[in-house]
């Protein structure tokens, strides 16, 4: 597979319409095996993923979407529900044996813990999109879901918090609008 700038960045697009075929379990595992290598603070790895990969589960996910995202969701055969785990710190003994106080996070105020988990899960989410594209698939990342419904149907008895959904598969390139502009370096960056 070509891990080129074109594949991952310059020619890759966010899709809103897909062909409906689902990915194989091998494909989903390959995406995760690359995405899990994302950098996170103290190797915290708070991202949790529910791969939705059957017609029945995709329909359940579509029903959790707000009106404007339901049809988009129904066009995809697979999706990744991305969440962050508020109990991420319970894995530090395995993930970060170098830490002197691996349980200190459990004493943090809930808002600080959530900011930490979300920031690091977002790093991993970016890698998830890059990994999916690198393996030759298209993505459709989006919010716009009833988070309580997603939690009820897909997260069960966990402390996972909904972040976003990424539709997966082969996008319908004919349904794409022209790429929107991006901010110039001078408008978005500073060098000090």
What are the residue ranges of the model-derived segments?
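Small-aliphatic-rich amphipathic alpha-helix that forms the alpha element of a beta-alpha
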Residues: 35-37, 80, 99-153
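Residue-level signal for well-ordered alpha-helical positions
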Residues: 63-64, 94-95, 153
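Short, solvent-exposed amphipathic alpha-helical segments in soluble enzyme
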Residues: 66-68, 97-98, 156, 182-183
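Carboxylate-rich helix-loop segments that flank metal/cofactor sites and access channels
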Residues: 88-104
